[in-house]
């Protein structure tokens, strides 16, 4: 059981969605989600740098205009990736929670948690990267059966409801 001490506010202009699937299908579900939603700008959160790099490379292989910021990236590499994302040269930024701290990028339409955040503060931080100003936004979590209990605790604690969506099984 996860206990959340203080009830933090989540922007009411954020739509919360979860997509239930297996760990094995995570990348394919991400790819299908990006193709279906066609986000103006999306940040994809991944929990570790090795996987982060692999996800970015796979997205690029599938012709998704993506870039990544790594925890161990140089200041120049980080700035180059952020500039590319801000200027619209790419519309998907793959990042870890730590790398995304303090980012203020306008017009991020979608937040996608490839790894479900097991800490409520992480979810608040991730979701808070979208729906800035007067904009609305979407926060999508790709989850497995083991994440459902945590997701339900977030719904209760934050007073939100996740819409469960299915992705088409074909290509």
Predicted regions and their residues:
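Conserved helicase RecA-like core
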Residues: 1-171
